[in-house]
Amino acid sequence: MIQKSILVIFLFLGVSLFSQSLEKQIKSKVSVLENLVEKLELKKIDNYKEKLALNTVDIFRKFAKWDENNIDENTKLYKKVTIYKKKAAEMATNLPDFEKKDMLLLLDESIQNANELLTGEIFRKKYIRPNWHKIAIKENTLVNGNRPVFLSDYTWKPGTNQLDKYFGELDVFLISPSQVKNKKGEITPQTIKKIKESYSQKAGFVFVSQKNIPKWTLTEFGEEFGEIQGKPFTKYDIDNPGARILMSNLFKGTVPFLRDKKFTQLGYMLTNEPRWANYTDGKKKVWFRQDVSNYTIKKFEIWLQKRHKTIAQLNSLWKTNLVNFSEIEKLLPVDLSERGTPKWYDWTTFNEERVIDWFQFLKAELLKNDPKAKVHLKIMPSIFTDNNADAGIDLEALTELSDINGNDIAAHYNNIKPKKIHSDWDKKYVFGWRELFMGYDFLKSIKPNQINFNSESHLLSGSHTRDLNMNPKYVRATYWVAHLLGLNASQTWYWPRQNDGSLRRNLTDGYAGSNNQQPRVTFELENTLIDLNTFSEEVTAFQNQRKPIRIFYSKTAAKQKGDYMDGIFDVYERLNFEGISLGFATKNIIKKQDKANWDVILIYNTEHVTETEFEAVQQYLDEGGSVIMDKNSFKSNEYGEPLKSLESKSNNLFILNSLEEMQLKALSFLRSKKALPEIVVTEKTDSDFKTCTWRSIKTAHGRNLLSIINLGKNKVQLEVSFSNKESKPVCKDLINGIPASSTPVLKPYEVYFVEVSEK
């Protein structure tokens, strides 16, 4: 026993001495980098990245110190994460040294870059940091002076000069129904005081939290008011008349004081991650499922009566024998097994329409008190990309209602909950990109002239994805492509540490293994934003690329067919590695937008459409638009009743047998329209699928720019060439200002950003 105790003591001393050795190395390398920063300054070479590295290290030294003294607390937090549960104590014990080793790697990389700058091996454009006090919105761009800018911050990050300077200055003000003091609509004095004393002149947004309601509402509007919810973040019944009274009073009492504040510039976020799931799935658990109130059921009865006119018509469609519409309640909730039936369609459509109506009301009430207000919602686009069964969320309609394209788009480094979340992206790709790519392309297709604001970016981590050993190149890949696809501002999830490294209270499973324990990951996000802002005009040009191919999306087919979005992804995936900026078409996009914005619409896996969707496509054909379609689409309406066939009078409807035929036809069609890129990127591999996604543009000054990202699991040999020229291209690495190979080998996650010219 004594020998064992002695061994433990020696092990502890060994770890302690090793940790002290790491700290000495950090101090030494900090001194080296500080000296190099001074030399760069003297040579008038931009050194902002090196200062960022020094500040990142300074912050994480405090974090590592706190972690050394709080192993038990970190052990508890690691136990909350599925992949770390069994080795939580080991993870917590090793964390401080992991952070220190990561800081040393960051310092080594920064020292190497600084030396290369000093010797002229690489070059760097001067970085102009965005002035958060002077941000303006110009259509779909954030500008600082005459230059586009991209803004980035973190959820819950403390406001200090050091953190604000290097990690974002977004100003967030929260209002909530809990601030309505009584049924008269009076606002709590502390809320008014806080608004009046807020003198910030920085860009920000108002977070309208729906999570807390005052106790008096349960007496005034009934106990059920707080029991019927839109879980997990809307804690009251939106169909109870009291909801409108409560929110009207909140806006009436707060918005007149908020309306001239700079932090309303990025709008009022009307709710956090909205969803209203009511369906059942046999005996399986449906996440965040909630019953509905009699108010909702009564609305549904009226909705059905307006739609179907008579109970006989409803019975005929639903295959029921109801006596009158008031008997509808006994058929609710709908079950997932009923998907594809008229009953399922009616409920899910009604559920979306009542939610749209609710947000239309909130926007109208807000505008009464601030006519210039912009609104957005923190919608999870995974509801769209994963074809969520019934969330009450119509992403297109709610984006049309918004003035800013709100979202909390995610990417997936891994899947830490495979039993709960099915995914198969890792068979071909190094990270899950479906939501990231399709989400932004869908938003950009709906409202191309609005900014995209990801107010809770899950590109780094989330409840289903996390890895303490994350490759920092993943960070660059995801944030780089997100901005090329249209992202303008983001608030990344998340920064739960205080200045001394201590943690916020009541942390759940979202913390352990995330960015506040990863110095290089944290650095790389800001490092990427520096490059994006340095080349902001070029990145904005990529954002505004014309989208010549539009993939048709039918919310009708999505409701009625569980795997509908898998088919849509199959189309998207086929074309995402051909250098083409992709977009979507819907009934509304076809009817409301200039059809010159695209060349062809692809329709695949879309059996069910409404008559209005059918008519929109038929009119598009009649006006000379081109459609490529599979033979299984546009067969029946929302209720399964057969539709007539689309007609073509100008040989502009192409009905093909396979997805491969559709892909080849789409590319040949663009070739005939001279709509393919001037640059060609060829993958020199034996693989039967491509993994390098790329886009190229020609700027207003005639420069050819090319961006490539390797989404695959293996390195790829590429060849860059011109589509219509014999000459060999000359490539220049824009970020490092040096020549680049026209036959690069890209590792997984690697970003290749070059200017391409003739030799």
Regions found by a protein language model. Name each.
Residues 78, 86-131, 137, 274, ...:
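Carbohydrate-binding surfaces of carbohydrate-active enzymes
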Residues 4-14:
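Sec-dependent N-terminal signal peptides
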Residues 20-106:
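Long, low-complexity or tandemly repetitive, helically biased scaffold regions used
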Residues 112-167:
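N-terminal carbohydrate-binding accessory modules
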Residues 148-157, 173-184, 227-249, 289-290, ...:
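The substrate-binding groove and active-site-proximal loops of carbohydrate-active enzymes
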